[in-house]
């Protein structure tokens, strides 16, 4: 369920603030969103995979914390990111 390096590099290139940026909240949130969508598809097939379900909940919580941080620090980047990732604003 890990992202392959090509898909990860594509996401990093799309959301990076500058060349080589992998640690900004935007990139981290985009990578987490991709992992969450992959795990969601996995759990649609394997409904009783409770270990993956717990991992999914952990990833969702981490993304939620990063989104609240980004909303607090840079609201314009936050609103742009949630529109690009099709996430709901709370």
UniProtKB/Swiss-Prot annotation:
Gene3D superfamilies: 6.10.250.3130, S15/NS1, RNA-binding (1.10.287.10). Part of the 30S ribosomal subunit. Forms a bridge to the 50S subunit in the 70S ribosome, contacting the 23S rRNA. Belongs to the universal ribosomal protein uS15 family. InterPro entries: Ribosomal_uS15, Ribosomal_uS15_bac-type, uS15_NS1_RNA-bd_sf. Keywords: Ribonucleoprotein, Ribosomal protein, RNA-binding, rRNA-binding. The gene is rpsO. It holds the Pfam family Ribosomal_S15. The keyword Ribosomal protein applies. SUPFAM superfamilies: S15/NS1 RNA-binding domain (SSF47060). GO terms for biological process: translation. This is Small ribosomal subunit protein uS15. It comes from Campylobacter lari (strain RM2100 / D67 / ATCC BAA-1060). GO terms for molecular function: rRNA binding; structural constituent of ribosome. GO terms for cellular component: cytosolic small ribosomal subunit. One of the primary rRNA binding proteins, it binds directly to 16S rRNA where it helps nucleate assembly of the platform of the 30S subunit by binding and bridging several RNA helices of the 16S rRNA.
């Amino acid at each position: 369920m890990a992202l392959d390096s090509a898909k990860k590099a594509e996401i990093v290139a799309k959301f990076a603030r500058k060349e080589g940026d992998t640690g900004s909240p935007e990139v981290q949130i985009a990578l987490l969103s991709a992992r969450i969508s992959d795990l969601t598809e996995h759990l649609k097939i394997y409904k009783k995979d409770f270990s993956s379900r717990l991992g999914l909940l952990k990833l969702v919580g981490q993304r939620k914390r990063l989104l609240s941080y980004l909303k607090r620090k840079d609201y314009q980047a936050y609103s742009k990111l949630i529109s690009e990732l099709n996430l709901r604003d709370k």
